[in-house]
A protein has these predicted regions:
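Polar, low-complexity export/assembly segments characteristic of proteins
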Residues: 2, 74, 78-188
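Amphipathic alpha-helical polymerization modules
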Residues: 1-90, 162-267
């Protein structure tokens, strides 16, 4: 009985540790996805303002600033130096461009990403894994596509936003056609941020319950060692409600995954 109880206690502690790691990553991602969503909203506003004011002279500068910040977010690392949004390629920066001219020169926006395809998962219970990883290409493709479109048009014969005091007909038509994509990008990133927040809250609840589970098992082991098995089992049975609640929350985590909530990139 003692050996089985010690095994169960060690397993519960390990799952609690894994879940807390997942909570920490989801919390960090929440901050960064919120910032990325804000950048998408900035780009949408920059296009809208250019149309409303009949002046896009500052749009290239704003677009480059947004690219700088988005790249910094998507190439961020954890405490161990691993790229958060790189998937299994966590030792390689997932975003490979740093300037609008580089972005405009790509055949496809997908060439701007070098992340892997496997999203990070964490085992939080027996047979229960939760996907918490987010890929740079999943949340960054649409934003970089809009920036690529702007950079490509600006470099073309009818572009040159910075050199125009008022919008030409071609510039107006381009920005008008680009605005819906910018709106969709901002909406999708808001959805991704909310989805990550849901996963974070679910994991946080589970971590609390797993702490209860770990404490119960540790107490059970201590009781066996210091009292007798019969008394220990009686004490454990008295805590069945808390034990069942902790196990139920852990089991429900198998239904939680960012994959179920993130909109697919359209680029």
């Amino acid at each position: 009985v003692l050996e089985a109880a010690q095994t169960a206690s060690a397993r519960a502690t390990a799952y609690q540790s894994n879940t807390q790691m997942a909570v920490n990553q989801a919390d960090l991602q929440d901050t960064q996805l919120t910032a990325l969503s804000g950048l998408a909203s900035q780009l949408q506003k920059a296009i809208s303002d250019a149309l409303a004011n009949n002046d896009a002279s500052t749009l290239p500068t704003q677009a480059q600033s947004i690219l700088d910040q988005a790249t910094q977010i998507l190439n961020s690392t954890d405490a161990n130096g691993n790229y958060l949004y790189g998937g299994e390629k966590d030792n390689t920066p997932p975003v490979t461009v740093s300037t609008l001219s580089q972005l405009a020169g790509l055949t496809s926006v997908s060439d701007a990403f070098d992340n892997g395809t496997e999203k990070k998962s964490v085992q939080v219970g027996s047979g229960q894994s939760v996907q918490i990883g987010v890929l740079a290409s999943d949340v960054g493709t649409n934003l970089l596509q809009t920036l690529k479109d702007i950079a490509g048009f600006d470099a073309g014969p009818t572009g040159n936003f910075a050199g125009s005091t008022t919008l030409t007909s071609a510039q107006n038509d381009f920005l008008t056609s680009e605005l819906p994509q910018a709106v969709t990008t901002a909406t999708n990133l808001n959805t991704a941020t909310a989805a990550n927040g849901y996963v974070y809250n679910s994991l946080q609840d589970a971590a609390t319950n797993q702490g209860t589970l770990s404490t119960l098992y540790s107490g059970f082991v201590s009781s066996i060692q210091n009292v007798d098995p019969a008394t220990a089992i009686t004490q454990l049975n008295a805590n069945q409600t808390a034990l069942q609640a902790a196990l139920q929350v852990t089991a429900q985590l198998g239904q939680v995954s960012l994959l179920n909530y993130l909109p697919a990139p359209t680029g």
